[in-house]
Amino acid sequence: MGDNLVYAVRSSEGFYLKRGLGKDAVTVFEQNKTSRDVACNVFAYSNNGQLFAYCDNQVTRVFEIATNKEILCVELKRTRKILFSPKDNFLLTFEPWAVYGPKTAENQKPEPNVRVYSLADGKHVSTFSAPKEASWEPQFSDDESLAARMVGSEVFFYTNMSFDRYDHKLVEKGATNFALSPGPAPNHVAVYVPAVGSTPARVRVHRVSESFPVVGNRTFFKSDKAVMTWNQRGQSLLILASVEVDKTNQSYYGEQSLYLINIQSGESVVVPLEKKGPIYAAKWNPNGREFAVCYGYMPAKVTFYNPRGVPIFDTIEGPRNDVFYNAFGNIVLICGFGNIAKGKMEFWDVETKKEIISIEVPNTTLFDWAPDGQHFVTCTTAPRLRIDNSYRFWHYTGRMLAETHFESPKELWEVRWRPMTGYNKFAIKELTKTDKMAAGLPIRKKDASHPLNNVPAGAVRQAGAYIPPHLRKPLGGGGSAGPPSAAAPTPGNQNQRPAQPRANGNGNAPQPFRPQQSEQERKAFQLKKKVEEIKVLKQRVANGDQLQPNQMEKIQRENEYLSELSKLTI
């Protein structure tokens, strides 16, 4: 299982690539550099997974993974970022922006810090300057016919990967960032302008052409930055707007709001959120037909929406702050990482909206789905945590396959999967009791001979609710637990008054014993609740209120609920 998967590990001891997840993993490439002065600072795969690039503080090098054939090697010691163009025809490198020479020199100009190389022949193609590391990357159309980058508040568009002279220019006064749409032509570009004084912030979407016509627009207040995310088809745009300081002092995270622009209709809507609080994550499903939002004060909520911004499903609240879809969009992970040390991970079937399994992997700082959509890696990395660094491979059923630990002072920095094609969407299996018992981290005991040592957490039952001794089932069996009043009177004490229930700490008598509801009773209760909700919705319609599409759909299913309820109550 996962024998063909390839992954790269970068640590304080260098880096290596391996194929396979278990003990039989084969080393594909390895470079051991024990000195931090020559450690690997950055690596990257090409989009098709055939090439691997890295910088080890000596050179920047690109080679073929399958053959180890060197494609490019240049003396760039300070490379901090590496980017492959969408079709892997070009490589871009970024170095920190710096000015060389005497500080008193006149007309000082920084050295160009972004270089473009052709991977077909290894030749240097172009060079330009990018002052900010956060926004150095040019953005490309999928066919590489178009490249765009921002200079000041202007977006320059280039063709043929030549950054010496732009072909088109879009000017938006005060703009701070942009997002070029993926998908087939015509491409669109979204540009964000922060709020200034009484002037609201805005996002404008232009069609890329000589005239740059506006096809979408959204204005909003309380925003000094925005993250814009296109769906895979380039037809819808999510805008996560935020302001760093919450003037009401209710949130450490500032204030956030979420908007959606549909390019085909030109409509823009506010994405409705049922709970107040910060927005931790908003991500598109790779299929482009839905997106998930994690939001609200802890315990946080996760809601799924269709491309029109209408809620279609939400989960119960819990300790989570991120979501991750797998490559096929049929499994989504809802998790709490980073400052949520518990590391709870919930895997959901996207189509059926049912939870597959839930496990806990504490102190997780890095997560990555494998290209097959079934495996994933969890890591504890430096500098976030400098002790107990490790990486673990898992199957989506919650079963751990392998783990590797780094003893202090060794540090783990990064683990990434190699992109690979040839995998197809798979059917999600329904877990058996045995599958669930094999899920979770193995329990570690100081005593290696302890019977629970190395037993998966799923095999250990959670402690049940406390049952007072007088309600417990007798050890000899026979007879069920029940309240004292149900017991037969003791001979010789027939005239004794029955004992009154003893008050608890707050002076109130304890609640009487109630038997647990059966599955049929629970279903009937839920159906009755839905029928009552439908009655309220019908009354709102009679009063002339406008209902949401999902509320109208609920009303249409009234007969279905009544039919199911009648079957359960017969």
Swiss-Prot record:
InterPro entries in the cross-refs: TIF2A, TIF_beta_prop-like, WD40/YVTN_repeat-like_dom_sf
Coiled coil: 519-541
WD repeat positions: 274-316, 318-358
Any one cellular-component term (Gene Ontology): cytosolic small ribosomal subunit
UniProt cross-references to SUPFAM superfamilies, sorted A to Z: Peptidase/esterase 'gauge' domain
Biased composition (Low complexity): 482-492
Region (Disordered): 468-526
The entry's keywords: Coiled coil, Initiation factor, Protein biosynthesis, Repeat, Translation regulation, WD repeat
Molecular function in Gene Ontology: mRNA binding; ribosome binding; translation initiation factor activity; tRNA binding
GO biological process, one term: regulation of translation
Record keyword Transmembrane present: no
Biased composition (Polar residues): 493-518
PANTHER family according to UniProt: EUKARYOTIC TRANSLATION INITIATION FACTOR 2A (PTHR13227:SF0)
Cited function: Functions in the early steps of protein synthesis of a small number of specific mRNAs. Acts by directing the binding of methionyl-tRNAi to 40S ribosomal subunits. In contrast to the eIF-2 complex, it binds methionyl-tRNAi to 40S subunits in a codon-dependent manner, whereas the eIF-2 complex binds methionyl-tRNAi to 40S subunits in a GTP-dependent manner.
Family to which this protein belongs: Belongs to the WD repeat EIF2A family.
Name of this chain's protein: Eukaryotic translation initiation factor 2A
Protein encoded by which gene: eif-2A
